[in-house]
Amino acid sequence: MNDFTFPENKTLVNNQLRNFQYTNGKFQHTIIDPQKPKDNQINIGGTDYFFINLNNSGKSKGSNSIILKLYESQNFDLEDIEYGVPDKILKIFSIPKASKSYLKRSLEKRFEKEIYCLDKCKEKKYQNVITIYESGTCKIFDSRRRVNKEYLYYTMEYSESDLKQFIEENSSMDFKNKINLCLNISKGIKELKSIGFYHRDIKPDNIFIIGETWKIGDLGLISERDEDDEIDKENEFIGPRGWITPEAMNKFLCEGKQLEFNYDCKLDHQSDIFQLGKVFWYILQNNAPVGVFKHEDFQLKYNKLYPIVRTMLNYSKKRRYNDINEVIKLLEPIEKEIQLT
């Protein structure tokens, strides 16, 4: 564990890290000033870092997390302040530890499980899941209650772009790179499955490019195969809206109710395959399959791909692929064929 404490003039306001000062009997909050790096310094595992918000507005990606860029202070020129590529990303769970709320405690358990899964992937030296570095507890001053509170955190590698942003900026990506991208993501799902985890939140925003490799990140909704301690609540809406699976919608609408018919409400590896099919469609032709669709809706003229994606997107798990290995084995010959043309 690598615990640390934020500077005394930092606090959380609406899930955003802010400066604060006590003036005329009132606390005043201001956005962190990137031009004063010495005011924004922390030490993690014996290394000093300057930190800034992920974006200029201070808003973080993710409703339950604070995301900061970290820069090693020894490599930083204080005479010519310029923020380039960060050394790491810091992700902090925005709810204090030891909360008495059942909902907040459940969210904390999910963050702990995310860290556990990323640590397992790091141990295995997996290549298509985001790499974690340190994890532990950090202290941030609560300016309202005037006490330090503890928050879970972890650091990870920096990504230049997520899939959504990348496709919007590279809409003319060639077919070879699209297939390589689909394979990278599939291998990430395979890596998670090999250690007994399902992602359950596969969408373009949670897929990141590191160098030339695509990796899966944001494991906040992962589930462990055959787990005894079930975090999910009955009728909970699990997964990204717009990329939702049939069984996730069944869980939300039907679970635990005395209905005329029985529906599959279990989110598992085949649910990941369904979501991945939607992401493949988005990669291949830049939109998403919604409602009833046919072969003519698939605008790509390469005929070997549509049957693969269509099988992944079947409503019933019985008609989907059982394992992501089946998808990988179908994509690899296509990749080789393209390389020869």
Write out the residue ranges for each language-model feature.
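Conserved short submotifs of the Hanks-type protein kinase catalytic core
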Residues: 146-162
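AlphaC helix of the protein kinase catalytic domain
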Residues: 163-173
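Conserved HxN/HPN-centered segment at the entrance to the catalytic loop
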Residues: 122-144
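Activation segment/activation loop of eukaryotic-type protein kinase catalytic domains
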Residues: 210-243
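Activation segment signature within eukaryotic-like protein kinase domains
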Residues: 181-182
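ATP-binding glycine-rich loop module of kinase domains
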Residues: 66-116
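Catalytic-loop of the protein kinase fold
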Residues: 193-209
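Juxta-kinase regulatory segment immediately upstream of eukaryotic protein kinase catalytic domains
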Residues: 1-56
